[in-house]
Amino acid sequence: YYLNYPILFDYLSQAEKPVVWTLHDCWAFTGHCSHFATANCYRWKSGCFTCPLKGIYPRSIGLDRSRENYADKRYYFNKVKNLTIVTVSQWLNQLVQQSMLRYDNLICIPNGIDLNCFRPIDHIDPKYDFAGKKVLLGVGTKWTREKGYDDFVELAKHIDDDYRIVLLGLNVNRVNRLPDKIIAVHRTENMDVLVQLYNRALVLLTLSHNDTYPTTNLESLACGTPVITYPTGGSPEAIDETTGCVVEAGNFNALIEAIRTIDRNGKAHYSAHCRARAEKLFDKDLQFAKYGELYKQITDPAHNAAVKITD
């Protein structure tokens, strides 16, 4: 967001080298925002102005330059002749096709994860027993309303006492104001802790209102834990009917019923399907190989004629 892109794209257009640009959000084709869903704003399709999200990250203080930013991006980002755009979800891929980015070379390569790290385990540390309650897990790095914090607080008012919401990544201010049925686990860089929590959970809840393709969904599935998600961005692409479900954003009756359905069926009903889906679709080595094939295509004309990348 803070790159001097006019200088960069001037250079790339003059260098005449193959370029691969991986998009993780919508910033490249809007006049300001990285996600537009919460504002229900589609001005990016024709030209941004009077941005309703200029106070949201990446925050703009003072003047609204969304009109100028949009024009600048349209000019500079379309200058590179030999550019391939990669999106991490089909949802984002479809948005790019509707945007001012005019490139035919557009493919989807999803995020990948380390399946040796994120895996089912037999032993859970007793400190994550949580008094034997059934764990509804939420994982985040910066908990905001857009990332679903308010939804978890509201959900806590409606769940039965045999459930507990466990939120990973809360800051101190949030921790001090939590309802009784929410347990905080401080942010950690220790992957073992994350794997323990995924395995301990009955289900991962992805209640974000803005997202592109949450890696947490993939990590949870790899650990054998099903996912319930809102229909946000590309989040539903990670699951199918054997590994979780999609519920309407903010519909807590539907969310609670989905939780109860998974609970009635039992986590074991889903675990093997979750792991199998992760092994088939989300192995990081699989995604690395797709990038490798892409690089061969754009640098080797003979290889380009013989091999085609598939999404």
Residue ranges and their predicted role:
Residues P226-T229:
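Short hydrophobic beta-strand element within catalytic cores of glycosyltransferases
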Residues H209:
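Aromatic "clamp/platform" in nucleotide-sugar-dependent glycosyltransferases that forms part
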Residues Y128-K147, V153-K157:
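Conserved donor-binding/catalytic core segment of Leloir-type glycosyltransferases
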Residues Q196-A201:
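Short alpha-helical donor nucleotide-sugar binding micro-motif in glycosyltransferases
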Residues G169-V195:
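Nucleotide-activated donor-binding/catalytic signature segment of Leloir-type glycosyltransferases, i.e.
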Residues W91, G112:
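Carbohydrate-associated surface elements
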Residues E241, C245-F252, T261-K267:
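Conserved acidic donor-binding segment of nucleotide-sugar-dependent glycosyltransferases
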Residues Q97, I113-K127, N176-R177:
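Acidic anion/phosphate-binding donor-loop and adjacent secondary structure
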